[in-house]
Amino acid sequence: QPATMSGMVDLSAVSPAIALGPLDGRYRAVAAPLVNHLSEAALNRARLQVEVEWLIHLTDGGVLPGAPRLSETEKSYLRGVVEDFGAEEIAELGAIEAETRHDVKAVEYLLKRRLAAAAQAPGVVGADGGPTVLPTVGEIVHIFCTSEDINNLSYALTIRGAVEQVWLPAARGLVEDLAAMAHEHADAAMLARTHGQPATPTTLGKEMAVLAHRLRRQVRRVEATEYLGKINGATGTFGAHVVSVPGADWQAVGRGFVEHLGLTWNPLTTQIESHDWQAELYSDVARFN
């Protein structure tokens, strides 16, 4: 008879949690730098950042009729919510999502809670020097956005961070190590082959230089990656935007926001950003590997 789980310890109840795969298990020490970029918590922090910056972008630009402009202390408070995102916020977000059953909506609700709490935050005042208006702008949060508007930008930010702060430094270091070995062993003669048969000699340094040259080329391709983003609504048409605020140049608003995040504007999409840039990036990384 095959073995069953009957009578066995329920491993899902063990604390601390058992890793589901080796990246979070035996290789965790090696993969740890990626936690700040590619973990679920890092993704939610990026989502919170996008929601905050979208709110600031709309109010700063005077796009929404009647929406108040935010003071510098109010913007600083909002960005501080992102900077302070940690264990307490992760737990709170998990509790919210247990009710919403929707990850992006949970982030939206968390931000609305922080907006409501701004009235008690020391030093946060409105643009006129009076009480902060943050508790009154909760319904502007996520306005005109579909979840993919938030997600595509958040993934672009987190992937860019992982590539630029973790992968590229490691890749450049490997290339430089190979280049140094190529110089060190430039005169170390060794047998070369053609068609599996002994041929004219080569050196160990030259063969290491071949590898360094190939890898350096892939590094340049990764360095040139365009991290694309869009924020054009549920079908990629700015439909709700134009109906609600027909006088705004929504292409310019969207482009300005995406570029403000340090990403490249994708002007034509469906509901989702096409993700072609991700396929290109992963192909470059695969060739490096």
Give residue spans per PLM region.
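Active-site-adjacent structural elements in folded domains
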Residues: 265-272, 276
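Short, positively charged and aromatic/hydrophobic N-terminal segments
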Residues: 1-5
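A conserved active-site cap/scaffold subdomain adjacent to cofactor or substrate pockets
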Residues: 274-289
